[in-house]
Amino acid sequence: MSQDAAIAEQTPVEHLSAVDSASHSVLSTPSNKAERDEIKAYGEGEEHEPVVEIPKRPASAYVTVSIMCIMIAFGGFVFGWDTGTISGFINQTDFIRRFGMKHKDGTNYLSKVRTGLIVSIFNIGCAIGGIILSKLGDMYGRKVGLIVVVVIYIIGIIIQIASINKWYQYFIGRIISGLGVGGIAVLSPMLISEVSPKHLRGTLVSCYQLMITAGIFLGYCTNFGTKNYSNSVQWRVPLGLCFAWALFMIGGMTFVPESPRYLAEVGKIEEAKRSIAVSNKVAVDDPSVLAEVEAVLAGVEAEKLAGNASWGELFSSKTKVLQRLIMGAMIQSLQQLTGDNYFFYYGTTIFKAVGLSDSFETSIVLGIVNFASTFVGIYVVERYGRRTCLLWGAASMTACMVVYASVGVTRLWPNGQDQPSSKGAGNCMIVFACFYIFCFATTWAPIPYVVVSETFPLRVKSKAMSIATAANWLWGFLIGFFTPFITGAINFYYGYVFMGCLVFMFFYVLLVVPETKGLTLEEVNTMWEEGVLPWKSASWVPPSRRGANYDAEEMTHDDKPLYKRMFSTK
């Protein structure tokens, strides 16, 4: 039998072993073995691209995987529910009576400090949970990890419901429930990104944000339904419904496949094949499934050569992980600095300030706009790409925030804040708040989760995603805690702060964030390792699809003047 024939009869796993053995001998020269092994662990040094790609099928073929990913994404609903309900709790009479303080005349109130702590401490719990509990996904699998963090979330809800009149008990409950949501925020997008077909990955990961908006909207509606009660029904019923959402999440995990990348990492090759086959609705022995498994195994085997991943590897610039970590943390931070939670956490309070008699109703309007707009976001993320959507989102939100803040500063109180507000100015502000929410929900709401979930190599993915997501929670805490103080001091001038952040976001995306639409996770990794310039990334072609005339070096440098580079795509 010839050598070529022998290779042709090898299984994908046997072929991979042969390739790895040969490449290992090449990479083992004494002079720079350690350096090359480190690079090889992230995919450099050899190319393991699937020879046969999984074909794109009609939309009806992806109904099953879409439903499964929506079940995983339901973790976002849990987070959104908290955001939608807490904004109403802090304005409900029974909640204020139990957890607030008393003026000298006997009236109850929540101080700015206590309000800020109750609202925002949830984010600190989320940041800690994202860093600590996301490790469960590497240890026991993404599915088991999600179930465990949901149970932790339930414990936090029990503590909150059991609170009678001690605000610090409620405070502790929010920290613990935040731990669970922090783990969910890392593991849900991670699992979706690893089970979804590459041409649907952006859409399906965006379903996590869709669930967040659904939770916010229904949370607003529940607050509206309970506001007329005079007892703890006002806030205990919305909290009690959290048990239903958590149990649905746990039940849904029994129907979804485990990450094929995790299964390959722990040696469960047959299960990895089945997971890929189920997600793409093809036979387990389909050549495209075998090729996909081989590509995944190549990355896993290369990672094993370098040993266990450490936290220190997140700061490696040689393998471009540090650059990716900074970009991921910045994208997540900037999502908060858009000012979205200024509306969502304090929506009820804001619209009282513009003179509305029932600000709960206005919050519902914002919730409807937010939820409906996210469907548009799910479409545009794959139609126009991550980078383009982020740029348009930053530009359009800037315009909306300028109008919103300017009207609030110059027209809302024409005769001073001690006089009635202008109804026309208030209506104008609500309209532009809705425009702003539309622009946010279609771009910066879902896309940061997509970008972060597909940026990092498997070897350090959970660690890197937890750090990037923690940056989001940290800024969420800062905005949630300090907003009452800032708005009390400068009122609607606060909008100009977010406007400045939005301008910065536009240029940051323009110069730093690459386009990853239509690429496998392994191809995204290769693009980062090749050092492709972000403004040329849309034209980058993976090694497996390059023609003879393709110039890879052209993607890594640009001799044009800066002003031309910024708006160049080639």
Swiss-Prot record:
One GO cellular component assignment for this chain's record is: cell periphery
What cystine pairs are annotated?
A: none
Q: At which residues is glycosylation annotated?
A: N91, N228
Q: What biological process terms from GO does the record include?
A: carbohydrate transport; D-glucose transmembrane transport; hexose transmembrane transport; transmembrane transport
Q: Which UniProt keywords apply?
A: Glycoprotein, Isopeptide bond, Membrane, Phosphoprotein, Repeat, Sugar transport, Transmembrane, Transmembrane helix, Transport, Ubl conjugation
Q: Where in the cell is it found?
A: Membrane
The lineage's top-level taxon is Eukaryota
What Pfam families does its record include? Answer: Sugar_tr (PF00083)
The job of this chain, per UniProt, is described as: High-affinity glucose transporter.
What this protein is called in its record is High-affinity hexose transporter HXT7
Q: Which organism is it from?
A: Saccharomyces cerevisiae (strain ATCC 204508 / S288c) (Baker's yeast)
